[in-house]
């Protein structure tokens, strides 16, 4: 693991939400439907009570709950405490970073010859939702509503890039911008099954790299499953650590 990049990552995590006793950093979606713990520095003995408190708080809000664990988080038994609290571990992803100040020549060349994806308007989020549905995603309407709220209230923090083929939306991804930290993040990449393995995902990545540079970002981050990580490493992204979401099942509320 790269210590400078880990330090930068933790700084971004601490900025991404609201501090709460623990200490933890709590991130709440604009519509209040999702609560996520994105950073923690709790003592071993305090962990169980803090986890119970945060899960109960989320359920009291009627929100989904997630604790986002990273490979370098402490204490080492944090993952065990999350499981013992009844949270469910989802797929582990690799955290990768790209230095936008020193792009690989292959990426610069590809950006020159690749037509950029379309930066979506709020109205075009309907096309993003269409891609999501055709990709088998759930909660599409709620996601579209959250994205529309963010794009309306804080347009400098979020972009959605869409690739169209013959007028139909086939691939897309989000770009999250945190201008004070000069960091940006790729998220929400998805492609309609019939159009996969045709370079459309790469097009959305290149388009978002260009947009991140234009916005003044210096480092671009992404959490990637193995298939996406393979494409991203070929574009110069470097593995930094791993991350894994732990989500609360509604049964916890009654315990």
Question: Regions from the language model: what does each represent?
Answer:
Residues 47-55, 188-193, 197-211, 224, ...:
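Conserved acetyl-CoA-binding loop-helix of GNAT-fold acetyltransferases
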Residues 1-61, 74-77, 154:
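N-terminal charged segments
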Residues 47-123, 222, 228, 244-248:
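Acyl-donor-binding surface of acyltransferase catalytic domains
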Residues 1-17, 94-111, 135, 153, ...:
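Terminal substrate-recognition subdomain of acyl/acetyltransferases
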Residues 18-21, 77-88, 157-172:
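Conserved beta-hairpin
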Residues 139-194:
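A conserved beta-strand-loop-helix scaffold within acyl/acetyltransferase catalytic domains
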Residues 27-38, 90, 177-187, 196:
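A conserved beta-turn-beta hairpin within the catalytic core of GNAT-like acetyltransferases
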Residues 121-134:
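A short, well-structured alpha-helix characteristic of acyl/acetyltransferase catalytic modules
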């Amino acid at each position: 693991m790269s210590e400078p990049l880990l330090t930068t990552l933790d700084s971004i995590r601490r900025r991404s939400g609201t501090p709460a006793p623990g200490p933890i950093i709590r991130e709440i979606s604009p519509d209040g439907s999702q609560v996520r713990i994105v950073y923690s520095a709790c003592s071993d003995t305090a962990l169980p009570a803090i986890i119970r408190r945060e899960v109960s708080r989320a359920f009291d809000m009627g929100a989904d709950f997630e604790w986002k664990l990273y490979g370098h988080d402490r204490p080492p038994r944090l993952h065990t405490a999350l499981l013992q609290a009844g949270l469910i571990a989802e797929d582990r992803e690799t955290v990768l970073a790209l230095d936008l100040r020193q792009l690989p020549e292959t990426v610069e060349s590809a950006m020159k010859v690749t037509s950029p994806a379309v930066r979506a308007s709020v109205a075009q989020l309907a096309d993003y939702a269409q891609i999501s549905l055709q990709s088998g995603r759930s909660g599409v309407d709620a996601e579209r509503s959250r994205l529309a709220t963010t794009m309306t209230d804080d347009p400098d923090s979020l972009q959605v890039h869409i690739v169209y083929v013959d007028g139909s939306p086939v691939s897309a991804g989000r770009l999250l911008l945190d201008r004070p930290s000069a960091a940006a993040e790729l998220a929400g990449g998805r492609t309609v099954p019939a159009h996969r393995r045709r370079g459309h995902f790469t097009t959305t990545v290149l388009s978002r790299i260009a947009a991140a540079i234009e916005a003044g970002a210096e480092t671009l981050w992404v959490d990637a499953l193995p298939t996406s990580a393979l494409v991203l490493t070929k574009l110069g992204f470097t593995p930094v650590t791993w991350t894994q979401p732990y989500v609360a099942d509604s049964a916890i509320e009654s315990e």
